[in-house]
Amino acid sequence: MSKGRAVRLNRETDLLKLVAIVAMFIDHLGAVLFPGVREMRIIGRIAFPIFCYTLAAGCCYTRSMAAYSVRLLIAALISQPFYAVGLNHVNSYMRELTFANPLLDSVKWYLYSFKTCNIMVALLLGQLVIWTLRERKYLLTALLAFFILFLDSHGWIASSYGLKGILLMVLFWALIDRPLASFVWVGGYMFAWALEGRGYDYFGITFGIQLFAMAALPLIYIPLDRHFRMPKSVFYLFYPLHLLLIYFLNTMI
């Protein structure tokens, strides 16, 4: 596989990130504050495929995969406590802590919170897999795959779509220079994923809510020429801050 892949899908990745950020915010507001408003969760389904695609495109554009990994790692570590409290992912291990030793129990609370990882962890794992494939380090790819399978089997990356989500990132990257093949394979993969769920019946077929994630595909595959630019820091800062905002809103309502 060539390192220098030409991105032949939508190159307006900053604009796509902005769309995904807004959709994610609506989704998370719906999950925590308006659980009965199903439409908010439906809107939010477009966010993850877009993040997967922009991650794949970023792996083609970046000058340093190592620096890219470090940014994602730092974002994942910083965002985790905000994710845990913002989206109510406080597990039984965390609740049992008495904080008799504030420092030690705070460290334990933080480590226990990774029983449910934030999306930055999934993006980091996807980026690392793509990096090993790009460099043809297939032994490292295999080791990473086993590690991801372990995390997925224990539910630690389930909230970030688990193994399926990481495979979607790799699929976007592998076919990013072949639009038609990418559309067929990615569309088919996402459709099959939607068939695994329940709750929506169309044309005699039962789908899960992931069916609505396919609404992201036109945004990804139709080229735009807007030249919209957004600082890299916006997404990395917005992610933990919007979770903190949701936490405060939830405590006030």
Kindly give the residue locations of the regions a language model identified:
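Alpha-helical transmembrane segments and their immediate juxtamembrane cytosolic regions
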Residues: 1-253
